Amino acid sequence: MNRKVGPVLEYSRRFSRVLCALRDEIRDPLQYGYQRVNTAEGSLSTSTTATSLDTIVLDTNAEDLASVPPRTLQHHQPQRTFSPILETDDTNPFLEPVEKAKSKSSLKSSRVSFDQEDDRFDEDENSFRKQREHFQKHKSHSTSEHKSQLIKELRHLLATDNRRQFQGKKHVSLDVKSAKVLEQLLKASSSSDDFEGQRKEFQERKHKSLDARHISFKFDKEPSPSSSDEDFEPSTSLLRIDADITKPVIIDLKDLDSSDEEDYISSRKHFQQSKSMSTDSRKSIRFLEMEMGTKEENMRTAVPFVRQITEEGKPKLEVYRPTTNPIYIWTQVLAALSVSLGSMVVGFSSAYTSPALVSMKDRNITSFEVTDQSGSWVGGIMPLAGLAGGILGGPMIEYLGRKNTILATATPFIISWLLIGCATHVAMVLVGRALSGLCVGIASLSLPVYLGETVQPEVRGTLGLLPTAFGNIGILLCFVAGKYLDWSGLAFLGAALPIPFLLLMFLIPETPRWYVSRNREDRARKALQWLRGRKADVEPELKGISKSHQDAERHASSSAMLDLLNKANLKPLLISLGLMFFQQLSGINAVIFYTVQIFQSAGSTIDEKLCTIIVGVVNFIATFIATVLIDRLGRKILLYISDVAMIITLMTLGTFFYMKNNGDDVSEIGWLPLAAFVVFVVGFSLGFGPIPWLMMGEILPGKIRGSAASVATAFNWSCTFVVTKTFADITASIGNHGAFWMFGSICIVGLLFVIVYVPETQGKSLEDIERKMMGRVRRMSSVANIKPLSFNM
């Protein structure tokens, strides 16, 4: 009975204490909280590790607490060290007070010192110690077995790394000793295929000794389980070199020590010297120097093949090759020659009025009357129609293509010359000249665009000047034929010139960039393959063209005119317009159109028709000189030379005519006009004649190239019309000397324009030029032209 009543009394006592505590807390919560804090501070253990209130520690006996009534317990609360608050459902027994020393000895590493003895802690501690000792023993046994394997793997990695470093350094040391063999092979080879075969056979023999599969590793010495990295001492040389250098190199891993650097370096040098001495006559490398304008870059065309083992176990070859294709010149020359024949027709048309007007005004030859006013229109209507042709040509090259636009001018050229040759009235001559001028405007726009998009940057300057050179051939042909033919026969000769041009245009492809703009990449690839050669890898260039087109599409607007007025596009357009302006305002077309009349007014002692022929020959020769120099000196240097030469000669001509008009005797210097004209034409043909047309196809962005070239061409022919139509009026008002001084002053301004605004485009791809002009350029060094190509054998 007492056993059953005891727990009930115990629970009732606990419940009464809880109620008392709650009552005190409700009456004065703040005071009760302070009391609890004070009692807690007093009850903390004096142990150095007891620093928190996480554990409740009792210093009194539970029996004493049980014998005290609840109210007495309340009054004596501050004298107690601490009184725990027990929940009603707490079934835990009261903790018996224990000695603090026992708690400290068993929980020295604990953060809080418990004043309670618990055998389970000692048991857990003993169990933990036993398990830890067992684990350490097990670990020592297991790691001793794996340690040897780990050391073996580490040494294997070290040997592999040292071998690869050694091979790489060995190849570098042998590079400079390898030029003679390939030269001998090249001289002894009958063809490029023969040379390639001998070179590959030589390289295969050469690299047998370098193949990673010929290197064996020896693991015959196993380290003891208790050994460490410090126990290994090198006893022999790192490398054992056989007498036959082509035999595999044995790297003995049992003798390998990463700290033995001196022994390794000595062995490597000895091996390198022996290898290079024994294979001096067989090792080869050839460096070809490729000249790109004024930049000379050494391009690697053959290097040692350093074999490395890939994860699949196959040897990996890494070679360095130029990223640009070798220049396959013949197809590009054919393309440039085909379109340049059209430029010859343009030159013939431009020079026609100079010899033809003299015979056309002769009533003994001509059945209709040609007045001075109608004669000026015969000379001036062609550039005016060229203005319309330039405007019309822009949409044509975008929708019909570059090639088809050029091809479309051949038949109208023939019709225009037949109209002039069969003319019975001056109106027929004017209609023929207008139709001819329309074709001239379209052709002068599309020819540089076609060549700029098909020719490689390395030869774009030279081949890009072929249209100008053939244009000067047309001028020379017109001057020479004009000495023997009248205006009608000269027109029939002009009708025959477009025939070879028409036939050759069927042989060349459309430009790859136009195909890409029309999403016809297969046709673009075929056209690029035709231009670069059958063996050329055209994929990188095709990807560059596609990327440039995509960039242009992202930055394009819905309106073509808005594209032209875009700030990024406006800069190259204004540069092109400026070059066209200073080209025509130099007075070149006034000189070409009225060469005979100028020499007649100068009173030169030399026959005026012979003078025109001399000027035409010099013009032709100077243009071919420019084709040689343009990729060596660059565009801007030739523009400087051209402008300075024109300034000097125009001022000299102005001074000569000024002296003549003032009545001074100039008979002793009658040769001066011809000499000045020759130097003027040479200067113009070197720079300001061909380069504005060439740079129009280079600096204009691809997205607006058609419309912008149309505007530039129309502007050029507008300036031509103004100069040729008003030249007679200008000379009548201010004299010949005033006209030439005016042209010379404009050339001075043109020189400043070139210095400040015109960029250099020599040796740059159209994509690089466009990124620079659009402000999206990323400068690359010449090393960017060489990149590693990896492939498996």
From Swiss-Prot:
InterPro entries: MFS_dom, MFS_ERD6/Tret1-like, MFS_sugar_transport-like, MFS_trans_sf, MFS_Trehalose_Transporter, Sugar/inositol_transpt, Sugar_transporter_CS. It is found in: Cell membrane. Residues 115-125 have a biased composition (Acidic residues). Its main location: membrane. Residues 1-326, 398-411, 456-460, 510-572, 631-636, 690-703, 759-793 are cytoplasmic. It comes from the Eukaryota. The chain crosses the membrane at residues 327-347, 377-397, 412-432, 435-455, 461-481, 489-509, 573-593, 610-630, 637-657, 669-689, 704-724, 738-758. Residues 99-148, 213-235 are annotated as: Disordered. This is Facilitated trehalose transporter Tret1. It comes from Anopheles gambiae.
